[in-house]
Structures are given as structure tokens and as C-alpha cells.
């Protein structure tokens, strides 16, 4: 278990500014989680991180750009089998690394401080990643590895415009980008207002069932987006509701997980 984190621990003190990969989205998920964490969990997290949890939510992204830890790039993706089930035992799969990091936290009294710190940062980040639909891949479905599509404003004559968009950009930046002039806490509050009535239902389950749940969303969305036809902007906007739901699930589930680990 320790082997998979050894390079991370070795570089821990060397990592500086995180490279941007929807940092605001991860920070918002962490901010939402903090709203529902117990005082004990918050205290434990603060003691381990010695930094703000919201800021540290993007730490794992910086490792994939370090030569010694470039292998962690694959950890950000989650694979389902052809039946949409999370059965993988692959060492480089996100859900496997998440489970390993959770195990370290549960056994933290017997682990080094560096390993526990790296594991907590890994948990915070990967719970966010698994709720980004472009990070879920389904065996036998090449479209889940990413694709481009064309969008139109449906204007007439000179007012008509069309442009290329991508599956990755849709889930990672399109909707989050509208809120980046606010604070993560403000965006988290906005998401909470929208989704709080379903919080109890959303926070149930395990990391593997959460990925499977996301896979169901992927399967529903693909037929409408993986097409050679022009897609009206109105259709794209409808997916903001789905995106907000995914963000809410991530925040609520992260809080529930950390509350359980640090109970």
C-alpha cells in the first residue's frame, strides 16, 4: 500500500503551485464538503493538512506534471466494465487509488505523517474527479475517452454561428467557468440551495457505487452529444443541471466520507 505513494511522499515538500485543471471546481466541492463536516473531522483535516482544505483540493493535479510522479496522471480516471460496474483492480485506476488512500487514513495511527497527508489530499481530489463525467470511462465505449462536437446558436443568415466544443471541456470548464468570479464558498452555497433536499440520498453508497452512478449519467448524455449533427446551445445549457447535481454529490459524499473516517 505504501509503495504507490512513495514518490508522492518524496516530492511532497517540492510541490509548488498547482497546474490548473478545473481548480475552482475542486475548491467548490471542498467548500461544500466543509459545510457538512463535523467539528472533529474539520479539526483532524486541519491538523493533517496544516493548510486550507479548499486550497489543497487541487494538490494532486501538480504531481502529474512532475517527472517522478507523471504516472499519477491515470489516477484521475475511473473505469467501468461493459456492464457499467466498477470491478477494476488496476493499480492506476482512480477508484483503486482512492480506496488505498482511504485505507491509509483509517490506519493513520500506524502510518507516517507524510503518507497520511498525501493520502488525505488524494481523497479530497479524487472524490471530485469521480464526479466529473469526462473522467469516467466505460470499457467498449470509445466515446467515453473524449470527443468533439459542433454547437450552433441557430441564428439565421449572418447571425448564424457554429463552433467546435468537446466532451472534456463541457464537464470540466463550461459551467464552472461561469462562477469563477465568485468565491468557492459562494458557488458551494448556490449548489447547496439547489440540491440540499436530496443530500441524504446523495451521500449514501461507496466510491465504487458513486462511479457507477456517474456512468449512468454518461450513458444518458452520450446519445445527445456524440453526434455529427449541429447541437443547439439550448440543448447544451440543459446539462448544467446535471453538472450541478454532480458537484453536489461530490461535496456531500466527500463530507460523509471524511466524517466517517474521522469519527
List the predicted regions and their residue ranges.
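Positively charged n-region of N-terminal signal peptides that target proteins for export
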Residues: 1-4
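N-terminal, motif-rich segments that launch catalysis or mediate targeting to/interaction with membranes
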Residues: 19-126, 133, 138-263
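Repetitive helical segments and hydrophobic/amphipathic motifs
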Residues: 11-12
